[in-house]
Amino acid sequence: MTVRTRVAPSPTGDPHVGTAYIALFNLCFARKHGGQFILRIEDTDQSRSTPESEQAILDSLRWLGLEWDEGPDVGGAAGPYRQSERKEIYAQYVQQLLDAGHAFKCYRTTEELDMLRAARKEAGIHSALKQSDLMLTEQEQAEREAAGIPYVVRMKVPEEEGACQVTDLLRGNIDLDWSMVDAQILMKSDGMPTYHLANVVDDHLMKITHVIRGEEWINSAPKHILLYQYFGWDVPVFCHLPLLRNPDKTKLSKRKNPTSILYYKQAGYLPEALTNYLGRMGWSMPDESEKFSIQEMLNHFDIARVSLGGPVFDIEKLNWLNGLWIREDLDDAALAQRLVDWKFNQDNLLAVIPHVKQRMETLGDFLPMVSFLAANTLGITEESFKGNKLDLEDQKKVLQFALWQLDTMRTWERDDIFATLKGLADGMGIKLKDFLAPLFVAISGSTASFSVMDAMVLLGSDLSRARLRVAVEVLGGAGKKVLKRYEKEFAALSQLNEESDAE
């Protein structure tokens, strides 16, 4: 048997460090066993998937030194490797399940589903919705079918009491109650599969032997095992890695820490150091050494050494490790070249010069005006904001609301950023000049910078958002009570904007 592993990210946003973490362990496991590592793009969510996001995933994983044997860009015998290009394949298997009575067409509307869930909640029923809850009479189904009402295809799941036993490479046997497993949607009304169907079909057809993924998928394993049984296929070996955590032990999220690989690239981290750090997430070298290369990790890799305690992604620890790599592995010439490749190259200079050229009298004027673009910390304090018109509490609210609003943006272009911020300023009833003042300080360290929108484009979305988070903390942060109040006000503001747009 040839060991085959895979990583299957969704191209719906910036490439996540969690994707790199899962990819690294899949790569190491495959290489250790003389096998193959596959990259698959799970783009069934066509409303959110973008080619730009896919390319960013490919570029980021390669920047980290993670290479795959098969994938959308390198091809392979099991392709295509984008799920959006496999729609006809999934349709065949959905029909197979329908013909065998393992799935059913569900014509229930969103309103009906909401009513069903509300009634169950009121009755104190906590089990998942099953086919007996969802299926219509033959007459009702025929009427809806004749009316052309859209339907989804759902899988049938056990309704009797009992448990599904999931065998995990790290955890052993796990018993999961069937009562909590719902009649999962397998095919959406647009004909695209959900993750659960596409995942199982692709893993089988691509001959994946070991499914190494995050522990958030443990509760979905019964559905996947059931699908393998329905199709009469062998179940691959499951291995669920522990989730990355914030220092406060909560799940790693961009609301508390930068999670995009692009952030770390733009902030000046070495790819070797970031990969090294991800390799230490729940795993350790036999000699407990903290600094090691991918090749050294491969040489000593044993997945049994993975610890199930939630590994903490601590940026301070990453900073320390990155410093070791700079000092111990780069001579002066190599470091100079890394600096050029990172920021001080012609492409970057040409992007910046138009924003400062008209203000320059000597070449010496250039660096003071743009140094904030290359700085990891700006050294701002509460005092930095006191010259602005809004009081400090209102400035903090502006920064937090701006951060939340910018989080919703699909593109990061100047005009889009301006429209987003202006709309928020209007909604909050604040003059744009006063609204932007705290953002100038947060992004550039002063109010004397060139356009804050241009600065945010040059910094990129991740660095920009990270600086806004820092500024909120500088102004005292948002504790639980304040955050709850902010969230309520922001939700009301968003609702007003939606109603205004509808008119």
UniProtKB/Swiss-Prot annotation:
Residue interval(s) of motif 'KMSKS' region: 251-255
Gene Ontology biological-process annotations: glutamyl-tRNA aminoacylation
PROSITE patterns recorded: AA_TRNA_LIGASE_I
Entry-linked InterPro entries: aa-tRNA-synth_I_cd-bd, aa-tRNA-synth_I_codon-bd_sub2, aa-tRNA-synth_I_CS, aa_tRNA-synth_I_cd-bd_sf, Glu-tRNA-ligase_bac/mito, Glu/Gln-tRNA-synth, Glu/Gln-tRNA-synth_Ib_cat-dom, GluQ/Sye
GO cellular component, one term: cytosol
EC number: 6.1.1.17
Keywords of the record: Aminoacyl-tRNA synthetase, ATP-binding, Cytoplasm, Ligase, Nucleotide-binding, Protein biosynthesis
Motif 'HIGH' region positions after renumbering to this chain: 9-19
Subcellular locations according to the entry: Cytoplasm
Chain sites annotated for binding ATP: K254
Main localization (coarse): cytoplasm
Catalysed reaction, written as an equation: tRNA(Glu) + L-glutamate + ATP = L-glutamyl-tRNA(Glu) + AMP + diphosphate
A molecular function (GO) term: tRNA binding
Keyword Ion transport in record: no
Broad enzyme group: ligase
Domain of life: Bacteria
Protein family per UniProt: Belongs to the class-I aminoacyl-tRNA synthetase family. Glutamate--tRNA ligase type 1 subfamily.
Quaternary structure and interacting proteins, as annotated: Monomer.
Stated role: Catalyzes the attachment of glutamate to tRNA(Glu) in a two-step reaction: glutamate is first activated by ATP to form Glu-AMP and then transferred to the acceptor end of tRNA(Glu).
Name of the protein: Glutamate--tRNA ligase
Source taxonomy: Bacteria, Pseudomonadati, Pseudomonadota, Gammaproteobacteria, Cellvibrionales
Gene that encodes it: gltX
